[in-house]
């Protein structure tokens, strides 16, 4: 995907920002969010562990509440949870010349609208793919979660093309 050849759309106001597939919802036993843990290679795992180390304690004014199962490759904030997964596969949508992209504080993101009206964001032009999903209930804050995460992504995941 050539990020700069794609349309850019700024996401503000009430658009939904959640990933239907990645965020499995809440467990009835402990009300914790769950997320599928990626299985990247050793190099990407090392980058993701560094990202986990530098992630903010708050995103969109929500305290960190990591999803189950616990992993250095996933993180969460709030309830319903904003979910981050590091080391995900390259989304096939990156091959689409009509794909939408956004930029938040120097980090490019692929924007994918889901069937339920939610969105999935995946970093572009980084050595590892980082995916962020924001629940529909938090859509009113626009790109605030991506802005909050940008510094950590820039610090831990170098620019370049993921293998």
Regions found by a protein language model. Give the residues of each.
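Bacterial N-terminal signal peptides that target proteins for export
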Residues: 2-14
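C-terminal motif of bacterial Sec signal peptides marking the signal peptidase cleavage site
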Residues: 21-25
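Bacterial signal peptide processing site
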Residues: 26-30
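Post-signal peptide N-terminal segment of mature Sec-exported envelope proteins
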Residues: 35-57
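Extracytoplasmic
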Residues: 43, 79-83, 125-129
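Sec-exported extracytoplasmic/periplasmic mature domains
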Residues: 53-61, 154-158
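Short, solvent-exposed recognition patches
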Residues: 59-114
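Extracytosolic low-complexity repeat regions of secreted or lipid-anchored proteins
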Residues: 91, 95-163
């Amino acid at each position: 995907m050539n990020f700069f050849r794609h349309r850019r759309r700024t996401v503000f106001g009430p658009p939904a920002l959640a990933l239907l597939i990645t965020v499995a919802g809440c467990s009835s036993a402990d009300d914790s969010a769950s997320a599928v843990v990626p299985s990247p290679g050793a190099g990407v795992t090392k980058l993701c562990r560094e990202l986990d180390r530098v992630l903010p304690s708050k995103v969109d004014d929500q305290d960190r509440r990591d999803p189950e199962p616990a992993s250095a490759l996933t993180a969460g904030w709030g309830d319903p949870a904003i979910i981050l997964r590091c080391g995900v596969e390259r989304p096939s949508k990156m091959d689409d010349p009509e794909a939408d992209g956004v930029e938040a504080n120097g980090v490019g993101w692929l924007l994918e609208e889901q069937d339920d009206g939610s969105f999935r964001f995946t970093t572009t032009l980084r050595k590892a793919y980082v995916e962020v999903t924001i629940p529909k209930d938090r859509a009113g804050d626009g790109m605030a979660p991506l802005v909050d995460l940008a510094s950590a992504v820039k610090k831990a995941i170098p620019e370049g093309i993921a293998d």
